[in-house]
From Swiss-Prot:
The entry's keywords: Ribonucleoprotein, Ribosomal protein
Gene Ontology CC terms, in alphabetical order: cytosolic large ribosomal subunit
Coiled-coil positions: none
UniProt GO molecular function: mRNA binding; structural constituent of ribosome
GO BP, sorted A to Z: negative regulation of translation; translation
Assembly description: Part of the 50S ribosomal subunit.
Entry's family note: Belongs to the universal ribosomal protein uL13 family.
PANTHER family per UniProt: LARGE RIBOSOMAL SUBUNIT PROTEIN UL13M, RIBOSOMAL PROTEIN L13
Gene symbol of the encoding locus: rplM
Organism: Geobacillus thermodenitrificans (strain NG80-2)
Domain of life: Bacteria
Name of protein: Large ribosomal subunit protein uL13
Role of this protein: This protein is one of the early assembly proteins of the 50S ribosomal subunit, although it is not seen to bind rRNA by itself. It is important during the early stages of 50S assembly.
Length: 145
């Protein structure tokens, strides 16, 4: 009887991909980026091993939201002090903190736990079209849709 192949952490080969977020819908972008970070696009995918690739997201400030989400969607955070609840709309987030907007969407689609945190470290988000990772020779990744 054959056994299923299980990748080992030291056998994983990592590539670098560049994803352009300009004009893309936030959730659709985040789900594909999360799949790349997990390594689900590889035939050697193993659920309990971090076999994903590095992903660079550029033009984070040009990401789109559908419907009235720019004004209606709220981002919450709390300082853990009494009265420390902070609320921002999606428009404020896209204007001032577009990197955090994409990071929060992708983080929610990764596994919860130490493996998910390890995968999240391979995400690099930048506001403009420039990034400091030219030395890694990243490939351009075209999103489906």
């Amino acid at each position: 009887m054959r056994t299923t192949y299980m990748a080992k952490p030291n056998e994983v080969e990592r590539k670098w991909y560049v994803v352009d977020a300009a004009g893309k819908t936030l959730g659709r972008l985040a789900s594909e980026v999360a799949a790349l970070l997990r390594g689900k696009h590889k035939p050697t995918f193993t659920p309990h091993v971090d076999c994903g690739d590095h992903v660079i997201v550029i033009n984070a400030d040009k990401v789109e939201l559908t419907g009235k989400k720019l004004t209606k969607k709220l981002y919450y955070r709390h300082s853990l002090h009494p009265g420390g609840l902070k609320v921002r709309t999606a428009l404020e987030m896209r204007t001032n903190y577009p990197e955090q907007m994409i990071e929060r969407a992708v983080r929610g689609m990764l596994p919860k736990g130490s493996l998910g945190r390890q995968m999240f470290k391979k995400l690099h988000v930048y506001r403009g079209s420039e990034h400091p990772h030219q030395a890694q020779k990243p490939e351009v990744y075209e999103l489906r849709g």
